[in-house]
Amino acid sequence: MRSPFPVPMVPLTIKTWQKKLPNWLTIYRIFIAVPTIIFLGLNHLLGSVASFTVLGNVTIHLQVSLFIGGVLFITAVISDYLDGYWARKWRVVSNFGKLWDPLADKVIINGVLIALVAYGYFHFSFLIVIVLRDLVLDGLRFYAQEKQLIIPANQWGKWKTTWQMIAILMSCFVFSFSLKETNSANTKIFYWAIVHLPYYLATAFSLVSFGIYAQQIYKTIKVKVKL
């Protein structure tokens, strides 16, 4: 994902570790998916809960494994921004990064989404739409490359990834903490809204970005055929 921070354009003396660091962050994002999914599974299987009291009379229950999984995912999100930012800042964008950076995003995001669905944290219909969209879109990208078509990425796809990350973090941290009084209707509505709204937004951005990309490919092919 493209970093929102400005990249200075000044002469640089690049050290070896600076050339390698963005790629190592990409590799880290792939491998951190495994312990993240494991901790989500441990929470589902063991249900380790720590309870503590705040403000004198409010009891909070913390699902430890789910919380740790959320923290690990945050490190993946941070690495996603930093590898792109540093690669452009130091002008060390590599073919490895171009290939593996988007794949690393798919591994960590789709892997965690599958785990959350398997453990019942949100409905599988969201996952089906998102995964099918990615598969078809990857096929279209491969077709475009084979035909030497230049199809620029659109901002909707970046928003899709952003909302997917927000949705995962909401699932991990909202479900990690629960008050003792969680049976009230208002509390249930709040939990449902804050967890599910990001998934709806991520799904909407997925469909819109897919439609835009497919339309761009169709128009490009049409123009090329006329030529």
Swiss-Prot record:
Catalytic function, reaction form: a CDP-1,2-diacyl-sn-glycerol + sn-glycerol 3-phosphate = a 1,2-diacyl-sn-glycero-3-phospho-(1'-sn-glycero-3'-phosphate) + CMP + H(+)
GO molecular function, one term: CDP-diacylglycerol-glycerol-3-phosphate 3-phosphatidyltransferase activity
Pathway: Phospholipid metabolism; phosphatidylglycerol biosynthesis; phosphatidylglycerol from CDP-diacylglycerol: step 1/2
Classification lineage: Bacteria, Bacillati, Mycoplasmatota, Mycoplasmoidales, Mycoplasmoidaceae
Cellular component, GO annotation: plasma membrane
Keyword Membrane: yes
Domain of life (superkingdom): Bacteria
A biological process term (GO) from this entry: phosphatidylglycerol biosynthetic process
Catalytic activity, EC: 2.7.8.5
Protein name as catalogued: CDP-diacylglycerol--glycerol-3-phosphate 3-phosphatidyltransferase
Gene: pgsA
